[in-house]
Every structure is written in structure tokens, then in C-alpha cells.
Regions:
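Short, solvent-exposed loop/turn segments at secondary-structure junctions
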Residues: 61-62, 100, 134-135, 173-175, ...
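A general structural motif
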Residues: 51, 89-90, 123, 209-212
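Active-site neighborhood of phospho(di)ester-bond hydrolases with catalytic His/Asp-centered motifs
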Residues: 56-58, 92-98, 125-132, 214-218
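N-terminal active-site segment of His-dependent metallophosphoesterases
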Residues: 19-26, 30-107
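A short, solvent-exposed beta-strand micro-motif common in secreted/extracellular proteins
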Residues: 1-19
Length: 222
């Protein structure tokens, strides 16, 4: 509850609804530890997931500078052509982090990013991975650096199933920010914290051994 949301691992053969490009597999809740809440998710049955396509995008670094948005428009046009050419198959998009650039959030933030994505893509769900530049440089510690991400994008770690694939999204950026608000004050290690590892152990315990498991994170795990 301290994170202010609850999420599910969408099962194979189903999809959740979307808010723009964001799949609605999580819902915000109050952070009050004493309040009991009930949260319901609508699952919509779909077919054809075994032959799905996952488009993977990395390090967009959208910041509204150096013609990056114009370049992204050109890229999105090409990707939409691919999506159109494969419209007989279930298709999804996954990002691998650094969708934004935190030192330029004063002019281009998560709200701006989502407007760009919702303008660029229709009728396709985008699953996000958090990167080091998606953490709040003004915040101190690790947990506080992802609160902005929680509010706009969603969980920083989660899982979902599509067809015969179990996807796991991890946040392997452990921030040690001082909160000074400068790029120099942003300290981090490429590391998955204990909370995620405990969750991952439980998550994988529900996965059929015949499933393919795909793990996504921003920093390489080697």
C-alpha cells in the first residue's frame, strides 16, 4: 500500500482495458495502511496470443530538444506501418526504460511523454520498463525517486502473460540520490532490490514450467 497502487499479472488469453497506450493492469489506492479496499479488474478474453508480436523500444530519451520529437514521429510512422502490415496478429509494445530525461522534466515530463505516445499509437498496449533517467533527480533515496513514475506510468516492477510467454518487468536501478536536484547528485547502482526478488520468487511460483519467461530491465544483468 505504500506504493499507492495494486496490480495483477494479466493471465494468458486475456487483456485488460487501456487508458491510451497504458494497459489497465494496475489501479491506484490510498496509502492508508489501516483502510481496507477492494479493487476489481475486468479481463477481456482474446484469441491468437500464441503468435503475438512484441515490439521492443529502448532509450527513447524524449525531452523536446535537438529535434528528438521530430525523429520520434518518423520512427513511429515506420513502426505503425509494421503494425498495419501485421494486423492479423496480436501486437504489443514494450519499452526498456529511459523514455524520458529527468533533468529536462521542467519542459518535457511524463505527462508530455504520454501525450506523445497516445498521439503516435492507437489500439496497441505499451508495457513500460523504468530506466535510470525515469527516476526523479530531485528526490532523495530510492523509493521517493519513483513516486512520479507511479503516478503517471505505473508500477516499476510487475509481470504479465501473453500466449505461452510470461513477461517479467524489473526495476534494476537502485537510486542513492542526495536530493540536490542536479545530475551530479543522482547516484545509483545497477541492482534489483530484495523486495523485488521476494516478489519475483512468488511470481514465478505460479508460472507453468512449460512457459517461456522473458525478463526485461533497463540495465544489463551481467
Amino acid at each position: 500500500k505504500k506504493r499507492g497502487y495494486v496490480f495483477i499479472s494479466v493471465p494468458s488469453g486475456y487483456e485488460v482495458s487501456s487508458t491510451g497506450v497504458l494497459p489497465d493492469f494496475h489501479k491506484k489506492i490510498k496509502r492508508d495502511e489501516l483502510e481496507v479496499v477492494q479493487v476489481d479488474f475486468n479481463l477481456n478474453p482474446v484469441s491468437g496470443q500464441d503468435q503475438h508480436i512484441m515490439y521492443v523500444l529502448g532509450d527513447l530519451h524524449l525531452a523536446g530538444r535537438n529535434d528528438d520529437l521530430k525523429q520520434f514521429d518518423m520512427f513511429a510512422e515506420d513502426l505503425n506501418e509494421q503494425i498495419k502490415d501485421n494486423q492479423s496478429r496480436r501486437q504489443y509494445i514494450m519499452t526498456l526504460g529511459d523514455m524520458t530525461w529527468e533533468i529536462y522534466w521542467n519542459s518535457y515530463n511524463f505527462s508530455s511523454y504520454l501525450k506523445t505516445m497516445n498521439y503516435s499509437f492507437e489500439n496497441i498496449q505499451v508495457f513500460h520498463t523504468i530506466g535510470n533517467h525515469d527516476h526523479d533527480v530531485d528526490a532523495e533515496g530510492d523509493f521517493n525517486t519513483v513516486l512520479e513514475y507511479f503516478d503517471y506510468v505505473g508500477p516499476n516492477y510487475y509481470s504479465f502473460n501473453i500466449g505461452k510467454v510470461h513477461y517479467v518487468i524489473l526495476d534494476d536501478i537502485l537510486c542513492k540520490n542526495t536530493g540536490a536536484g542536479t545530475s551530479e547528485s543522482r547516484k545509483y547502482a545497477d541492482e534489483v532490490d530484495e523486495e523485488q526478488l521476494e516478489w519475483l520468487k512468488a511470481d514465478l511460483g505460479y508460472v507453468d514450467p512449460s512457459m517461456t519467461v522473458v525478463v526485461a530491465s533497463h540495465a544489463p544483468m551481467y
